[in-house]
């Protein structure tokens, strides 16, 4: 832990139940799968924070692709065949999960590009199926599809609420400025920061 040996006497250890209280189990799995291959795991907060970010990106990208409701066989796309080969090569190398995870992230990155550019829906659907099979099925890094979609809807409604609140505050601020109520306009400006 943080470059030191984990021990009770140093007070720098976590039990599994403590770790699961503090960290989402899938994020913890992501962190451990991403640990350097054949080396001791230096478990620290930076490792967890990085895993929260990268796992979140993976799940978000997967969810956005899943929401497209397409269906396609990923084997139709040569780039996914190549990713599969590299993934399996890493796993065949004494379960080098870090190499496998790099392939999962590369597929997610390419899928993100397709989503952002309005790419082929069949290709996006193929990438979704690939990620489901390899990141979800093999590595166990994805929540259930229904949970992913539920969380996306919750996030969208939260974004809408924030957007409506900001618009309301901007309108109030403009009204305060028009009526030369500078104190109220400044107060609203500070709230918007």
Regions found by a protein language model. Name each.
Residues 5-7, 11-193:
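Structural preference for alpha-helix termini/caps and helix-kink/transition segments
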């Amino acid at each position: 832990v943080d470059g030191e040996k984990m021990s009770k006497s140093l007070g720098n250890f976590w039990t599994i139940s403590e770790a699961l209280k503090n960290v989402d189990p899938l994020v913890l799995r992501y962190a451990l799968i991403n640990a350097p291959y054949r080396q001791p795991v230096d478990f620290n907060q930076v490792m967890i924070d990085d895993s929260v970010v990268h796992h979140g990106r993976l799940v978000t990208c997967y969810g956005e692709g899943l929401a497209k409701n397409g269906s396609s066989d990923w084997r139709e796309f040569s780039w996914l065949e190549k990713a599969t080969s590299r993934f399996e090569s890493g796993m065949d190398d004494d379960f080098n999960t870090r190499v496998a995870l790099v392939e999962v992230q590369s597929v997610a990155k390419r899928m993100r590009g397709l989503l952002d550019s309005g790419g082929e829906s069949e290709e996006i659907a193929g990438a979704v199926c690939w990620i489901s099979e390899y990141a979800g099925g093999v590595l166990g890094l994805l929540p259930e599809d229904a949970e992913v979609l539920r969380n996306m809807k919750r996030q969208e409604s939260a974004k809408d609420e924030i957007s409506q609140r900001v618009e309301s505050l901007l309108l109030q601020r403009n009204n305060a400025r028009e009526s030369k109520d500078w104190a109220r306009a400044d107060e609203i400006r500070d709230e918007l920061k």
